[in-house]
């Protein structure tokens, strides 16, 4: 009798586990691109709050979400190693996002323009990837089904 009860509990646990994953995988994937184009710490923090809230919401539902924050124009300061007012929060968010993911993309057009104006190379934080053009990256992500958010 104990063995039957144990087997039933294991079966229920497996059904619950696979039921949640099947539900998450059978639906539309959750993907969001967040635009940051202002050198404003409040806007940058709001973008990071949006990303964190998305991670927490879908984690509670046992679902994954992919978030990409694209910074260009004056917003590139968010991802500059020398001027970012939020680089500690970015490091923290990147560390806690698994199994979902938060990706940070820095516009190379903006980076090159800033380097030309400032007369020296600009270092981007290690959590960010340089993309050719921020606006193009946003457009391509939307074409792939990402939802668009501008804080």
What are these regions (language model features)?
Residues 22-151:
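Secreted/extracellular ectodomain signature
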Residues 7-19:
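Bacterial N-terminal signal peptides
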Residues 1-6:
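Positively charged n-region of N-terminal signal peptides that target proteins for export
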């Amino acid at each position: 009798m104990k063995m039957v009860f144990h087997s039933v509990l294991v079966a229920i646990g497996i059904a619950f586990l696979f039921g949640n994953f099947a539900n998450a995988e059978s639906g539309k994937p959750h993907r969001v691109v967040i635009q940051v184009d202002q050198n404003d710490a409040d806007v940058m923090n709001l973008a990071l709050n949006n990303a964190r809230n998305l991670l927490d919401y879908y984690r509670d539902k046992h679902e994954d979400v992919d978030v990409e924050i694209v910074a260009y124009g004056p917003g590139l300061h968010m991802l500059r190693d020398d001027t970012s007012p939020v680089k500690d929060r970015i490091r923290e968010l990147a560390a806690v996002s698994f199994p979902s993911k938060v990706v940070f993309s820095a516009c190379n057009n903006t980076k090159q323009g800033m380097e030309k104006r400032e007369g020296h190379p600009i270092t981007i934080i290690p959590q960010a990837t340089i993309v050719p053009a921020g606006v193009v990256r946003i457009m391509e992500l939307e074409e792939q089904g990402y939802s668009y958010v501008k804080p």
